[in-house]
Amino acid sequence: ALNLSMTLNNGSFNSSDFSGNLNITIPMGSNTVTSTIQILNDGNNEGDENMKISLAAVPSDYVILNNNITIRVHDINFVVQPWGSPIHPTYGLCPRNIPTGYYSTLEGKSGQALRQAIQDIIANPNSVRVQNYGDAYNVLKEADQNPENSGQVWMIYDEQPISKIDYQTDNSIIGKWNREHIYCQSRLGIPSSFIPNSIPDGINNWRLTTGSADIEASHDDTHHLRAVGGQENSTRNNRNYGVDYNGPSGNIGSWRGDVARAIFYMAIRYTSLNVVNGDPASSPTGQIGDLATLLAWNTLDPADDFEMNRNNVIYNWQMNRNPFIDYPALVNYVFGNLTNSTWNAALSTADFNQKTPTIFPNPAKNQIAISGLDQLSNLEIYTISGAKVANYLVLNESQLDLNLPSGIYLVKITSDTVSTTKKLIIE
């Protein structure tokens, strides 16, 4: 007979997570044995874990050919948030945790004065913290958490979740997620002498001084770091948005407004960074495009609860917020066609999403109806690449006959100065 013993413990997976006999015997004349291991529900939200089957040493006349087998154990005690994922967006369910008076110095300003006032807030050396790069994974596990399963993060371009524990730890990116720099790392202009600190030291440890000229801080700034599939991160590389990179085949563009607002934040937070029209080369550094595309994406993919939660989480770590998530309309006052207009937050907070305009049926075939409108509105339909294919004036309960090919479209409904964008599927 051959007596075998094994262990299953691996990291946080331990004896409280299973029951069963770990000492087994293969009888003389047999070559198999079975032992039943029961996975236990300990009632704790620990996230997914890996159980590792490891055999202890065997007699010298035996050779172990297969050992240290890892098996994924999914935690059923995950938490579900009240808001949706980026592909099922919700609006107004996640609170905007903006400190009182945080944006008060922006009021009544325009042009360069407004731009400087924003920078004075988000690059304030007296309050803004710089965490090290090793902490970024921990920040993203919280900030990019899948609202539908707290054991997962949401991958930005891939538009799907992945277990938090599947982050990249070595050179392999297959089946792993890692940290995407929205404003490409090679475009930041960080000195070659800079060596990021990859050892996490927690939320209570940060670099004491920073400012708008502190370009090294841009490497670790989680306002533009996102969880992403390792392979798609490599595919994006340092390509400009819109004119070159538009995501993997078949994506519905749920991330496009997110990257636009992250780029706009970076172009204000760091003096040496700019967002420009076209497809700029990666050298000289400090330029990324395409501005026209990103302005359109900011409108077509409005800030949702997922982004607002990100903003809240990152503020807890860095003590600064992305103002273009809190006030997406601010983008046009800084980068768009309202640079000569005076900013007034009270006139920009009317959230059209709260009026809950509804398009039905969705998916649709050749006809849709609009409800939830309280005044005459303009309705525009765009392809997922941003080309406008239809335009209508609509009232509440309007019915529209469409003649569109099958696919995914963005429907922008505008009333006065506020707007909302909905995704529409044509079968």
Specify the residue positions occupied by each region the protein language model found.
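Short boundary segments that mark the start of a structured unit
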Residues: 1-79
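Low-complexity, Pro/Thr/Ser/Gly/Ala-rich linker/spacer regions in secreted
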Residues: 60-61, 70-94, 336-355
